[in-house]
Structures are given as structure tokens and as C-alpha cells.
């Protein structure tokens, strides 16, 4: 099939790679424009753009697809289908309508649950038992299009990073399967029941809130790993918590105030219960096991964390 691929972050790369390996005619790869790196002013290309250029695929990086010129260039590609995976730009109706089979999206949730920008993180925060990938026929709404294929996977105690990687690989195989026999996967409208929205993660959410249950705090840690990174502060220094576990109730100290350490091994009282930090990163330092850090920078029982 003659395809345009549209994607930007690492999540999108496995799908592009799968389409390339399958021998599809990739007429163009669309990705968001290079942006300044976090440190310094040098522009950094997206993972999708880098992969496409390494494999000799033509790349386009418009800031928007709203102009008549951009839409005419897209229509001139004469596509069978466009495949979209975390592109990050709104597709106008003229773009959605241009390919003969429309635009197919790889979405990291079991639609209609968690429509929107952060489905993986929101599924973890909500304590969902499972999540998955939906191959969706795109329309003008926010992840409201008809569904062609859904597959699921347990959330378990996976971090957002690990789960995103798993869903990216799953979605790539699913999209390859759908495109190999498109009309065997007819679009099915999403149900009206069970709709939830996965709002974009705000950095302010990453500060650990010890006033909630230990179970919820541990979910925060997993949901924000690797980014933006769950954290607490002590004496003006930020500590990023990369992994934690819920402490057995027998290990908690009755009456301990939320946010106060209940031993010298970085167990922290919550409301109720407690968590123990198992992997941590101090500002400007490499990540390490919590026990290793504590040997160099002890945090005594009864210390209040913010």
C-alpha cells in the first residue's frame, strides 16, 4: 500500500519500522519540527525523523497542516492510507479525507477509555488492571473514531516507560496485521458507555502526595517514570523516586504523620499505609538503589519530606 506515516516520539518508531519491513510504499514521513534540546539551544530532531532519515525515507516537518498549501501537498501524495502514531498535530478534515482508506491511528488504550494525550499514565494512576492498543479509524473528534482492532495487556506493576514500550511494540504488530488485510477489520463504532479522558500530565502532578494512600503513591511513582519523574524535596533538594513498593501494614508505625519517614531505610508514611523507596535519583546525580544512596546520605527516622 502507498502510505504516509505521521508520528513523533519513540512510541511511534516501532510502527514506522514495521511498515517499512513489510514492504509498504512509504511516500512520506511526517513528524513535528526539530525543537531545542532540554539543555542548550541546539535543535533536536524527533526519534521518528531520525529513524526515517537513517532509512532513506522522505521526511516532512510542517509546523501545521492547516494551510491550503500543506493540505494540497498531502493530497498530492495520492495515498491509500495514512498511519498516525502520537504525531502531536491536529489533522484537518481535508487531511483525514485525502487517503482512499482514510487515516488509521495507533492509540495506547482500550477505547473509549482514556481518550486523549496521556492514556498510559492515566491508566496506571487509576489502578486499571489492564490496558491495551486500539487501531482506530480517525475522525474529527478526540480519539472518537471507529475501532478496527483492540488487543490488551496487564498493567501489573509496570512503569509508564515500560508499559509505553510494550504498547508501542504491540501497536506496530497490530497495524501491520490490519494493513495486510484491511477489509477483514471493518470499523466498529465506539460504545457510548465507558468514555474517560486522559488529560495531559502536568509537571505539578509529579510531586508525591503522601496525604493519599500508599497504593496511590506507588501508582504515582510508576505513572511518572521516566517523565516527568515523581519526586519529594528535603532541605531544598529534589529527590526523584524511580521505584517504590507498598510496605506491609505490619511494618507501618501507628499514628505516623503522612510524609514522615518511619525508619532509616526510606519508608514513608502515607494516608493510610506506607511506601518504601527502592530506587532514587538526587539532583545532578545518577540513579541508584535507595540503599546505596542512604549509605552516603542518610535520612533518619522521623524526617519530614515535602
From Swiss-Prot:
It holds the Pfam family Formyl_trans_N. (6S)-5,6,7,8-tetrahydrofolate binds at residues 109-112. GO terms for cellular component: cytosol. Belongs to the Fmt family. InterPro entries: Fmt (IPR005794), Formyl_trans_C (IPR005793), Formyl_transf_N (IPR002376), Formyl_transf_N_sf (IPR036477), Formyl_transferase-like_C_sf (IPR011034), Met-tRNA-FMT_C (IPR044135), Met-tRNA-FMT_N (IPR041711). The keyword Protein biosynthesis applies. PANTHER family: METHIONYL-TRNA FORMYLTRANSFERASE (PTHR11138), METHIONYL-TRNA FORMYLTRANSFERASE, MITOCHONDRIAL (PTHR11138:SF5). It comes from the Bacteria. Keywords: Protein biosynthesis, Transferase. HAMAP family: Formyl_trans. Transmembrane segments: none annotated. Attaches a formyl group to the free amino group of methionyl-tRNA(fMet). The formyl group appears to play a dual role in the initiator identity of N-formylmethionyl-tRNA by promoting its recognition by IF2 and preventing the misappropriation of this tRNA by the elongation apparatus. Its EC number is 2.1.2.9. This is Methionyl-tRNA formyltransferase. The gene is fmt. One of its GO terms (molecular function) is methionyl-tRNA formyltransferase activity. It comes from Sphingopyxis alaskensis (strain DSM 13593 / LMG 18877 / RB2256) (Sphingomonas alaskensis). The keyword Nucleus does not apply. It catalyses: L-methionyl-tRNA(fMet) + (6R)-10-formyltetrahydrofolate = N-formyl-L-methionyl-tRNA(fMet) + (6S)-5,6,7,8-tetrahydrofolate + H(+).
Amino acid at each position: 500500500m502507498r502510505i504516509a506515516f505521521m508520528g513523533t516520539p519513540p512510541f511511534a518508531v516501532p510502527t514506522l519500522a514495521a511498515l517499512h519491513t513489510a514492504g509498504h510504499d512509504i511516500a512520506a514521513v511526517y513528524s513535528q519540527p526539530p525543537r531545542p534540546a532540554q539543555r542548550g539551544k541546539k535543535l533536536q530532531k524527533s526519534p521518528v525523523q531520525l529513524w526515517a532519515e537513517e532509512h532513506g525515507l522522505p521526511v516532512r516537518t510542517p509546523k501545521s497542516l492547516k494551510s491550503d498549501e500543506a493540505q494540497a501537498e498531502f493530497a498530492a501524495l495520492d495515498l491509500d492510507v495514512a498511519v498516525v502514531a502520537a504525531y502531536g498535530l491536529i489533522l484537518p478534515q481535508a487531511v483525514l479525507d485525502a487517503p482512499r482508506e482514510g487515516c488509521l491511528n495507533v492509540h495506547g488504550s482500550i477505547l473509549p477509555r482514556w481518550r486523549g494525550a496521556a492514556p498510559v499514565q492515566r491508566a496506571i494512576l487509576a489502578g486499571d488492571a489492564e490496558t491495551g492498543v486500539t487501531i482506530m479509524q480517525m475522525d474529527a473528534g478526540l480519539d472518537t473514531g471507529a475501532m478496527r482492532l483492540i488487543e490488551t495487556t496487564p498493567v501489573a506493576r509496570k512503569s509508564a516507560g515500560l508499559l509505553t514500550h510494550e504498547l508501542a511494540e504491540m501497536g506496530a504488530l497490530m497495524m501491520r496485521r490490519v494493513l495486510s488485510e484491511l477489509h477483514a477489520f471493518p470499523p466498529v463504532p465506539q460504545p457510548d458507555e465507558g468514555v474517560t479522558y486522559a488529560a495531559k500530565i502536568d509537571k505539578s502532578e509529579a510531586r508525591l502526595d503522601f496525604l493519599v494512600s500508599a497504593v496511590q503513591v506507588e501508582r504515582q511513582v510508576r505513572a511518572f517514570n521516566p517523565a516527568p519523574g515523581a519526586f519529594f524535596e528535603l532541605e531544598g533538594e529534589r529527590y526523584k523516586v524511580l521505584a517504590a513498593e507498598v510496605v506491609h501494614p505490619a511494618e507501618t508505625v501507628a499514628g505516623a504523620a503522612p510524609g514522615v519517614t518511619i525508619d532509616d531505610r526510606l519508608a514513608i508514611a502515607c494516608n493510610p499505609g506506607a511506601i518504601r523507596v527502592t530506587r532514587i535519583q538526587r539532583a545532578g546525580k545518577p540513579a541508584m538503589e535507595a540503599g546505596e544512596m542512604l549509605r552516603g546520605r542518610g535520612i533518619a527516622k522521623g524526617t519530614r519530606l515535602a
